[in-house]
């Protein structure tokens, strides 16, 4: 059986309106829209059809170089925990996998890069705050016709009778999606479509949970009036001051208050904890995990939640593959924090998080650099110059064994 397939090639759409690019999987190579976007391009474009066919024939398609490059370095890759299919599924469905889009159910929308944070692993193309810091001008290629075509595709797709998934999940990315006016317009549109079908549709946001009160109130008010279930993806991976350093601009106290409001909301169906693992978060990761469990016990004991992590591969300086193997003790602390909560029935898909922890161990020290501390310090010093702060260097404490 082929070793190159991944369910993401069939189930995912990731559309970026500001840069006019489309991906099938957030880690895949992006492809520019044609001058005139078409519905065919969105879900059955030539490139993704080629990728699907090649991956079934054991060919490593260049779209997925992010994962292939990780494997070539001896690292674990996103595919290891993101792929949801196995050989039995492929065998039973192979006749319809080449030229079919009925498996799509995970639709990621990035309206723009408006953001209030300047995370040290992010870039100007994903954060307006970083672009402002660096004095970088990013071309906004937004085209109103693209939105018209996408809305038409989305409506036609949702109303189809042959869709296989029981639930369609529509995720808003950023930047910080709740700060984008486009977000509210699209939510209204999706709510209207949902009235025409009995399919289960969940709206989801990937948020930094750092919104000031006026914006947080606006999001909560929209959730209050929604007829759909919501998922809240929370982007964070560290605790307290470490989190504030990695996610420059974060207010940990405000994060905690917003986290509580999100998990307590009656329309919230699922909370997705989305840590981005890097050299500066390993030491406090177990503290963050413990804190998360405590929040649910105190404020939302009946709410389901899960973990869906990722690794930093860029900037390279923050990749845990360069650390020595002794740092495994911090991964083991994180593992212990999870196993302490074995009886928590509201932590769903727990096996996926256990697999992710295992891949952390595999990635650690895979490309060991004996000068990792010097590299990290120089990286932070460069960031401090741009961000006009002297506080980031405190993150070096996270590298104390």
Where on the chain are the PLM-derived regions?
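Conserved C-terminal portion of the radical SAM core fold
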Residues: 226-233, 251-400
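Short, well-ordered amphipathic alpha-helices
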Residues: 153-157, 183-192, 216-221, 255-263, ...
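N-terminal pre-core extensions flanking Radical SAM catalytic domains
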Residues: 1-145, 163-164, 351-401
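Intrinsically disordered, low-complexity coil segments
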Residues: 17-19, 32-36, 196-199, 296-305, ...
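A short acidic (Asp/Glu
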Residues: 10, 24-27, 118-123, 181-186, ...
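Core AdoMet radical
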Residues: 102-114, 125-152, 164-183, 193-215, ...
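Acidic/polar residues at beta-strand termini and the immediately following turn/coil
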Residues: 16, 221-222
